[in-house]
Amino acid sequence: ETFATFAVFNHKHMEAKERFKVVYSADATEFLQRLTSKAREKIISNARKASYTIDPKLFKKLTGTDLWELEINDGKQYRLLAFWDKTKEVDTLVIASHGFIKKTDKTPAKEIERANKIMKEYFEFK
């Protein structure tokens, strides 16, 4: 199952108020583990920054979808697709569905379909 395991990376507390917590699905965790430690650390750092600031260079909504894209450019265009879970009273979660290396200007339809499938499974089995 996609959501059998989750990895929640501890983000150090910053002075600003955290707007959401990032949760990485098994697929996203697997993607991160395949990367170099430098790329992985940059992605996790940018996810932490995005949770405290509104920066469309880091985290932006994909037009016409319920998905968001976390962008990291480090020689390659790393992307994590994500969706919001606002059903908890205390924490707002952003679930990183999976990651990929972007090779074109547009986000490939197959990656959007994959994220939508993971999102559907997440809310069905939650």
Predicted regions and their residues:
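Basic, Lys/Arg-enriched alpha-helical interface segments
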Residues: E1-Y78, K86-V94, F100-K126
